[in-house]
């Protein structure tokens, strides 16, 4: 009875066929008496791939059709079936091994559903890696083995047999299941299984040996992220604990200390701990030995990235920031680089990194921190953690409201216009602005960044270098992740994906609810059959003689009218099967037009003038009659039997009255006045001329309107393009202003460095002069007189013990090279005695002179 208030009513057509109640009773009796030989008898049959023969052989009914064991030829049983199914649909047990999917379906919010956790033998479950990456609702497939040693943990939920009457999200889940699975009946309920031979070879199936998704989910989530971060290994090891090699590579790549998160999350390093035996997995859902509250640093880092992407509205509104690096997150990262990363970081996405590499992590988180500090400067945010989603979105809303940027948007986020305005209004703020510093709360600054002020960090923290980012963070959730100092973030705005690990899949008594519903349906069935057998024959026999002549005169018109549509639903068991009354009503309602209709005043309006009918409708026949208050003063004792003949005649009278009113309305719309014999042709010709003129004007103005709409669309498109170009110019101008300010700072730094270098040169010169090194000092001093310069050079060259400067001058002098050449030529003459050498030397000498 618990399900009766919330399940939709109506005669539905099920997706499973059936014949008779005897077959269903045989199946239920078989379910009660099945023993351990169930899998031995049917294992060979199902192992060959004939999973669904049981549907065709037993033909179990899921819609309630022929549920009560009577043939469809019996009209009594047909009405019993329709009314019973519409009010109280039969229930059955359905087993779902995917506990995570049930949690995402908000199983706990359905107050009328009863469910329990059970163990099923003879089945195996597999995780489909691609479905997890695509965030499908169903990520498991179930396979039948027939081996009693293979056990899985599932949730048994009591739902209507007719799947079209399931709650909305459960119906969508059923449609998704039916794309790759088919139902199989077991003693404990219906289970949806998949033939592994029909699974696509491109899917990676991960066998869950323990049979419980909750046992291996944390390890799978960490390994799945490590694999997508290019830190993990093969897909076959995704269900094992993460290896030290993968964790070390992750720590080295993203600068997260290994000893810190090993000490904080010791359950991740389980290489030395053996797996639990299979018999202990039965109670693993309620096991307290596993710490499900802790979160891996790998998952936490991906969660921070997903929260950052949600600030830019790159993820859907209902997206769960659960730390699972899926395809939607990768797509959002690529879109962020194209829209924001290139503009504010001044670099392209690295091609030698994965989608979420160190450069992306540093750039995305640093941009969020930069915006956070700028919002703090504008006194728009009060949250102590930039990854407190509610506080950060409130800060964005305050800033947009302050500058009039949130007039048309339904959702608050960091759009390009808001970022441009944020960088523009905070660019002129310097670190010496005492008024801005006074507006900031000191505790907030110390909690988030520890040292330094947000004005400096709002300019310095924007980087693509992970080391620079880590150096500039000292608290909050990012500080807790990278340095172990800070407070954990608030996760009240989203439902964690790991909450299903702690959810209690136990409510009510499913067996008791099914038994109660079956007893109630059986009671209704017996009562209605007894009532039908008692009254149907009497009503049919009494009305057959009276209605046979009227039925012979009726037109053969199909009708879907039933007794339930005539009577108020006070007691269905009493009025459901008055078949004689039903036939009398149909005979009266579908009676052909004959002379007796003139007596019952059904067609009174046919014989009246339509012009007078409108005036007649406004007349007052009676007033202050006692019959007007009779229903209020005199109480009716319900139930009472209305007159079906009166109902049929009233319906016909209403039908013809409505038709007459429609006819009158049509005449009023086209009424032109009374025409006489003399003015008939003239008025009609004048009307036709005016009508044609109106048609021409309408066509003319409609063509003009189309031309105007086309021009309007062109102008609108040009305006949109112009606005887009203006936005790009504004963003480029803001970026140029920002770069010019940075360039000015760099120029001032260079000028100061040059001045320091000049001062150092002056000091060096003075020190050399003090030491008495006149040669060097004279070389350093500029010579304005040419004679003095030549004399200084000659002194340096003729010095007996020259210093390094004089030696260089001697080497570079022309006379030194000439002497060296003459000596070389003399040696060659003495050795070879060849005049050609002398001639060549003379030519070389002339060339040197030239």
UniProtKB/Swiss-Prot annotation:
Instruction: Cite the InterPro entries for this sequence.
Output: Stb2/Stb6
Assigned keywords, A-Z: Phosphoprotein
Q: Which residues carry this modification: Phosphoserine?
A: 594, 625
Disulfide pairs here are: none
What Gene Ontology cellular component terms go with this record? Sin3-type complex
Per its UniProt record, what PANTHER family does this chain match?
A: PROTEIN STB2-RELATED
Family listed? To yeast STB6.
Q: Summarize subunit and interaction data from the UniProt record for this chain.
A: Interacts with SIN3.
Name this polypeptide is given: Protein STB2
What's the name of its gene? STB2
């Amino acid at each position: 009875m618990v399900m009766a208030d919330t399940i939709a009513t109506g005669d539905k057509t099920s997706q499973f066929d059936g014949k008779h109640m005897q077959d269903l009773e045989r199946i239920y009796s078989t379910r009660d008496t099945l023993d351990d030989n169930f899998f031995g008898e049917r294992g060979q049959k199902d192992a060959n791939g004939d999973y669904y023969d049981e549907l065709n052989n037993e033909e179990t009914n899921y819609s309630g059709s022929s549920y009560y064991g009577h043939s469809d030829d019996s009209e009594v049983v047909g009405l019993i079936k329709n009314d019973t199914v519409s009010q109280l649909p039969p229930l059955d047990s359905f087993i779902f091994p995917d506990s995570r999917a049930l949690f995402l379906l908000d199983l706990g919010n359905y107050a009328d559903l009863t469910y329990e956790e059970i163990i099923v033998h003879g089945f195996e479950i597999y995780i489909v890696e691609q479905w997890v990456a695509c965030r499908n609702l169903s990520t498991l497939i179930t396979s039948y083995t027939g081996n009693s040693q293979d056990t899985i943990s599932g949730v048994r939920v009591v739902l209507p047999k007719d799947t079209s009457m399931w709650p909305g999200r459960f119906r969508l889940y059923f449609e998704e299941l039916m794309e790759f699975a088919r139902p199989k009946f077991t003693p404990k309920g219906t289970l949806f299984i998949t033939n592994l031979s029909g699974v696509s070879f491109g899917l990676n199936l991960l066998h869950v040996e323990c049979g419980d998704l909750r046992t291996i989910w944390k390890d799978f989530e960490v390994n799945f992220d490590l694999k997508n971060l290019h830190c993990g290994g093969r897909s076959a090891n995704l269900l094992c604990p993460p290896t030290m090699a993968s964790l070390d590579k992750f720590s080295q790549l993203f600068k997260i200390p290994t000893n810190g998160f090993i000490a904080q999350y010791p359950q991740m390093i389980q290489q030395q701990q053996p797996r639990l035996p299979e018999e202990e997995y039965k109670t693993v859902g309620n096991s307290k030995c596993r710490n499900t509250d802790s979160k891996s640093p790998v998952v936490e880092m991906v969660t921070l990235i997903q929260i950052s992407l949600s600030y830019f509205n790159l993820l859907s509104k209902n997206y769960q920031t659960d730390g699972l690096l899926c395809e939607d997150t990768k797509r959002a990262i690529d879109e962020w680089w194209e829209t924001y990363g290139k503009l504010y970081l001044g670099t392209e996405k690295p091609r030698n990194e994965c989608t979420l590499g160190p450069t992306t992590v540093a750039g995305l988180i640093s941009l969020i921190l930069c915006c956070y500090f700028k919002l703090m400067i504008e006194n728009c945010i009060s949250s102590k953690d930039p990854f407190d989603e509610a506080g950060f979105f409130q800060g964005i809303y305050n800033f947009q409201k302050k500058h009039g940027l949130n007039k048309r948007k339904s959702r608050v986020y960091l759009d390009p216009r808001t970022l441009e305005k944020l960088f523009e209004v905070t660019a002129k703020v310097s670190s010496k602005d005492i008024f801005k510093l006074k507006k900031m709360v000191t505790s907030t600054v110390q909690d988030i960044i520890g040292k330094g002020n947000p004005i400096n960090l709002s300019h310095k923290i924007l980087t693509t270098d992970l080391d620079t980012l880590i150096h500039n963070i000292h608290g909050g959730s990012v500080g807790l992740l990278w340095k172990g100092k800070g407070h954990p973030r608030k996760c009240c705005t989203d439902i964690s994906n790991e909450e299903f690990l702690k959810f209690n899949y136990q409510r009510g008594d499913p067996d008791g609810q099914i038994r109660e519903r079956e007893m109630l349906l059986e009671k209704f069935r017996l009562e209605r059959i007894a009532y039908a057998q008692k009254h149907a024959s009497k009503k049919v026999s009494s009305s057959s003689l009276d209605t046979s002549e009227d039925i012979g005169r009726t037109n053969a018109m199909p009708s879907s009218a039933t007794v339930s549509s005539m009577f108020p639903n006070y007691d269905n068991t009493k009025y459901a099967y008055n078949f004689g009354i039903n036939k009398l009503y149909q005979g009266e309602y579908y009676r052909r037009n004959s002379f007796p209709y003139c007596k019952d005043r059904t067609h009174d309006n046919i014989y009246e003038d339509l012009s007078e009918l409108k005036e007649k409708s406004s007349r007052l026949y009676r007033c202050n009659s006692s019959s007007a208050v009779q229903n209020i003063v005199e109480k009716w004792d319900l139930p009472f039997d209305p007159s079906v003949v009166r109902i049929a005649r009233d319906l016909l009278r209403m039908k013809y009255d409505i038709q007459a009113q429609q006819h009158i309305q049509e005449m009023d719309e086209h009424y032109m006045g009374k025409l006489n014999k003399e003015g008939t042709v003239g008025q009609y010709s004048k009307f036709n001329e005016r009508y044609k003129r109106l048609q021409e004007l309408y066509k003319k103005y409609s063509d003009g309107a189309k031309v105007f709409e086309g021009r309007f669309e062109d102008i609108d498109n040009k305006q949109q393009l112009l606005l887009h170009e203006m936005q790009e110019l504004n963003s480029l101008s803001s970026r140029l202003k920002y770069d010019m300010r940075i360039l000015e700072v760099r120029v001032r730094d260079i000028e100061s460095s040059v001045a320091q270098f000049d001062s150092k040169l002056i000091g060096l010169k003075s020190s050399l002069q003090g030491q008495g090194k006149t040669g060097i000092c004279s070389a350093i001093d500029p010579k304005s007189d040419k004679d003095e310069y030549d004399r200084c050079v000659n002194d340096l060259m003729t010095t007996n013990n020259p210093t390094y400067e004089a030696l260089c001058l001697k080497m570079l002098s022309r006379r030194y090279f000439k002497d060296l050449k003459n000596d070389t030529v003399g040696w060659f003459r003495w050795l070879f005695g060849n005049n050609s050498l002398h001639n060549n030397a003379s030519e070389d000498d002339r060339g040197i002179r030239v």
